[in-house]
């Protein structure tokens, strides 16, 4: 009698694990990754706001899109990746001897790596962007707020 219930429970567990559902052991890693992402976004914001770097002035005139809905799930990080690619193109971050640009490129590469790890196998999500655009600093601030929100729900 209990055999059917046990088999059903095992099948459900396997289905959840196969579909990338978070398990309790991965929650700690996810928290660390979200915290790292938050710190990298804050570092990138500091570098972007640095008035000494003239090449960044171009970026301050560029408009970025933010998701239409209030982002509350890790799958929304796909939207960050899409816009981060545009930021990289705006900065034209080819190998540079400029220390600030290299640090920005390193931060962006690290952010992309962390986002890909956090997304896992989720590829079906499509970003819906708001019609209004924001400047680079506000764009980064919105994603910092997103990470803080995600992190606070995990603790």
UniProtKB/Swiss-Prot annotation:
Alphabetized UniProt keyword annotations: Adaptive immunity, Cytokine, Disulfide bond, Glycoprotein, Growth factor, Immunity, Secreted, Signal
Compartments, as annotated in UniProt: Secreted
Gene Ontology CC terms: extracellular space
Signal sequence segment: 1-20
GO terms, molecular function: cytokine activity; growth factor activity; interleukin-2 receptor binding
PROSITE patterns given in the database record: INTERLEUKIN_2
Cysteine pairings via disulfide bonds: 79-127
GO biological processes: adaptive immune response
The organism's place on the tree of life at top rank: Eukaryota
Glycosylation sites: 23
Chief subcellular location: secreted
SMART domains: IL2 (SM00189)
Entries under Pfam families matching the protein: IL2 (PF00715)
Sequence similarity: Belongs to the IL-2 family.
Known function: Cytokine produced by activated CD4-positive helper T-cells and to a lesser extend activated CD8-positive T-cells and natural killer (NK) cells that plays pivotal roles in the immune response and tolerance. Binds to a receptor complex composed of either the high-affinity trimeric IL-2R (IL2RA/CD25, IL2RB/CD122 and IL2RG/CD132) or the low-affinity dimeric IL-2R (IL2RB and IL2RG). Interaction with the receptor leads to oligomerization and conformation changes in the IL-2R subunits resulting in downstream signaling starting with phosphorylation of JAK1 and JAK3.
PANTHER family: INTERLEUKIN-2 (PTHR48487:SF1)
Name by which UniProt lists this protein: Interleukin-2
Gene from which the chain derives: IL2
């Amino acid at each position: 009698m209990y055999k059917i219930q046990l088999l059903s429970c095992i099948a459900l567990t396997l289905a959840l694990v196969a579909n990338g559902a978070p398990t309790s052991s991965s929650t700690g890693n996810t928290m660390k990754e979200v915290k790292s992402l938050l710190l990298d976004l804050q570092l990138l914001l500091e570098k972007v706001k640095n008035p000494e770097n003239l090449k960044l002035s171009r970026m301050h005139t560029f408009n970025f899109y933010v998701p239409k809905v209030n982002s509350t799930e890790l799958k929304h990080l796909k939207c960050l990746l899409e816009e981060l690619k545009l930021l990289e193109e705006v900065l034209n971050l080819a190998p540079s001897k400029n220390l600030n640009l290299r640090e920005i490129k390193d931060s962006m590469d690290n952010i992309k790596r962390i986002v890909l790890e956090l997304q896992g196998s989720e590829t079906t999500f499509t970003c819906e962007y708001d019609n209004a655009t924001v400047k680079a600093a506000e764009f980064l601030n919105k994603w910092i707020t997103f990470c803080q929100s995600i992190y606070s729900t995990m603790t």
